[in-house]
Regions:
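Conserved NTPase motor "head" modules and their coupling/switch loops across ABC/AAA+ ATPases, GTPases
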Residues: 4-5, 488, 497, 539, ...
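Basic, polar low-complexity surface loops/patches
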Residues: 1-335, 352-358, 362, 425, ...
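Structured, non-catalytic alpha/beta "coupling" segments that mediate domain-domain communication
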Residues: 91, 179, 191, 233-280, ...
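Short His/Asp/Glu-rich catalytic/ion-coordination signatures at enzyme active sites or charged loops
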Residues: 362, 418-436, 507-510, 514
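Coiled-coil termination/hinge junctions
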Residues: 445-473, 554-560
């Protein structure tokens, strides 16, 4: 078969695929994502799914495989973990809209997102208690810098580095993906490769510091980056590369990035990769979390608190003032056991607002993400009223929990207690929030009640007790009887009222003028109700995004409180003592115990 005989659908597929040669293309066809040619061969093997054929191209059968849209996240995660990148091409219009352009018109499709190891946001694709970092390493003349972000939380940080420090810096972050210029030096490339993350080469232009500065100023709405700190050219280039890559992978829908924070060289302890691995700080030598120092110390009850603990352990501070402030915070909750338990009890009810906010910003969120923001802020407000005289670190955290009454009130009034996952399912706007929606729902629901009455009337009229009114997506509503009643239904006088629609192996299906009219009424009301709910979802999403800064600050405050309370619980339950920390070189430990060994012995019943 020649290219001239390529079907319009396959021509569209090949055009989209040509723009993403390094990615597996998930091509939406109805309820499935289909893959073709080499993509199908690779994906079928990686996912352990059936490989089939569909038509011919250039004289060769077209390899094909597919996965259901509703289960696609699990398949995506498998592909990402096996080193693939995935371009997701969605249908940009309904088939009915395509038909208006002609009966041979193909439904418009385009890539809406490029899924890579460092750009995951879905709850099912992420580890709740760990950050998922995307890093960029820039080299400008003699400068080297590292920028990193977790787009699921919006964190954005940058620091100067060097050939000597880049290895330990990357080991500390354990990024999922690292961006590097195609023009990087060989020594730098070799050092970055050692971190084990997926490496993504970008063009030299993506690391241009001048264009990066302009882009960052526009993104953050400032005239100069000096408002956030004094950044070197390599630091600006690294941040710019991150933003460029996010723009590419998210197809123009940038995540809600926090204002950039610059980490100073010497602000935290440098630990090289080998030492970090041998110390088993965040992971045991086996690669798992169990058996690590992190597992032994983690008493946090929120996902954000757990992520903060891992960051603190991976990057021990060298700032004596900051260390003392953290110790003061823990001590205050060690001394007040009642407050500590009250605090932890409330925190257990706090959802992962960081990641809910990120999904809403990327337009991938649903009603449950709105509910997570509402429920989290309700608990934040509750805590702010309970917590009084606290050390400075915790007092600052509590301040961020206040001032959310307006948003909480709006979300509480608008949402049901337990919304569905997806906005398209409807049923998430609370009764009483919108009179028009309530009326439309009543019409829809009453129409469905009339169906039951109509079925009873038809049973009485025909004398067929087994007659049912059913619904499917092909025929809509229809009257169904078993085939042994077909002759009666197809003969006068019943045939004058019941119009034959379909005969199957064991059933015969009919419609009536009254049933068709009622179906139109029900469908119109149902569709109208769903459209109203979708409008409310967008209004609520925008209301949350307008308060994104204060909401993000509240999540950071809750994480700080959770971490302090968790460490205080550890100190009380396991009899840990507060260290005396000063700027001397003295290291004096009396009666020390190994936390990981002690935990292992307790779990084995030996300690």
């Amino acid at each position: 078969m020649t290219d001239d005989a390529t079907t319009p659908m396959m021509a569209q597929y090949l055009e989209i695929k040509s723009r993403y040669p390094g990615s597996i293309l998930f091509y939406r066809m109805g309820d499935f994502f289909e893959m073709f040619f080499d993509d199908a061969t690779a994906a079928a093997e990686a996912l352990d799914i059936a490989l089939t054929k569909r038509g011919m191209h250039q004289g060769q059968p077209i390899q094909m495989c597919g996965v259901p849209v509703h289960a696609s996240e699990g398949y995506l995660l498998t592909l990402i973990r096996k080193g693939f990148r995935v371009a997701i091409a969605e249908q940009m219009e309904d088939p009915a809209e395509a038909k208006k352009r002609g009966h041979k018109a193909v439904v418009r499709r385009d890539v809406v997102r490029l899924v890579t190891p460092g750009t995951l946001t879905e709850e099912s694709l992420l580890e709740p208690r760990r950050n998922s970092y995307l890093c960029a390493v820039a080299e400008v003349r003699d400068e080297i810098a590292l920028a990193w972000t977790d787009i699921s939380t919006g964190e954005l940080r940058v620091m100067a580095s060097s050939l000597l420090r880049i290895g330990p810096d990357l080991a500390r972050l354990a990024p999922r993906e690292v961006l590097l210029s195609e023009a990087r030096s060989q020594p730098l490339a070799e050092l970055v490769a050692e971190c084990g993350a997926a490496l993504t080469p970008l063009s030299r232009g993506n690391f241009d510091s001048t264009s990066a500065e302009r882009r960052l100023c526009v993104l953050f709405g400032v005239g100069t980056l000096q408002a956030f700190g004094s950044f070197g050219r390599a630091e600006v280039a690294a941040m710019g590369a991150l933003v460029d890559y996010l723009d590419l992978t998210q197809r123009g829908k940038l995540p809600l990035l926090q204002l950039p924070q610059r980490e100073t060289v010497g602000g935290s302890m440098q630990i090289d990769a080998a030492t970090r691995r041998n110390l088993e700080i965040s992971a045991a030598l086996s690669g798992g979390r169990e058996g690590s120092l992190l597992a032994a110390m983690d008493r946090t009850v929120t996902a954000a608190g757990a992520r903060l603990l891992e960051r603190r352990l991976a990057s021990p501070s060298l700032d004596l003032t900051l260390i003392q402030a953290r110790l003061d915070a823990v001590r205050s909750l060690v001394d007040d056991g009642r407050l500590r338990e009250q605090l932890r009890e409330v925190l257990r009810q706090v959802p992962d607002m960081d990641r809910a906010l990120s999904r809403l910003a990327l337009d991938r969120g649903g009603p449950r993400d709105l509910s997570a923001i509402r429920n989290g802020l309700v608990q934040a407000t509750r805590l702010s009223a309970q917590l009084g005289n606290l050390p400075d670190l915790l007092a600052a955290a509590v301040m961020a929990l206040r001032g959310h009454d307006g948003l909480v009130g709006l979300l509480d009034q608008a949402l049901v207690a337990e919304p569905p996952l997806l906005a398209r399912d409807g049923g998430f706007v609370a009764a009483g929030h919108d009179a028009d929606l309530d009326l439309t729902r009543q019409l829809r629901d009453e129409g469905r009640g009339v169906i039951a009455d109509m079925q009873a009337d038809y049973v009485a009229e025909t004398g067929i007790p087994s007659l049912k009114i059913k619904h499917n997506n092909v025929l809509g509503y229809f009257v169904e009887t078993t085939d042994n009643h077909a002759a009666r239904m197809l003969a006068p006088p019943l045939s004058e009222r019941f119009v034959h629609r379909q005969t199957t192996a064991n059933q015969v299906r009919f419609t009536t003028a009254a049933l068709s009219a009622l179906e139109t009424r029900i469908l119109n009301a149902g569709n109208r109700a769903l459209e109203i709910e979708k409008q409310h979802f967008e209004t609520l999403r925008q209301a949350v995004l307008q308060q994104a800064g204060p909401v993000a600050a509240a999540t950071r405050g809750l994480a700080e409180l959770d971490l302090a309370a968790g460490l205080a619980d550890l100190a009380v339950m396991d009899n840990w003592v507060e260290p005396v920390v000063d700027d001397s070189r003295a290291f004096d430990v009396t009666g020390g115990r190994h936390p990981v060994v002690e935990r292992a012995l307790h779990r084995q019943g030996g300690g």
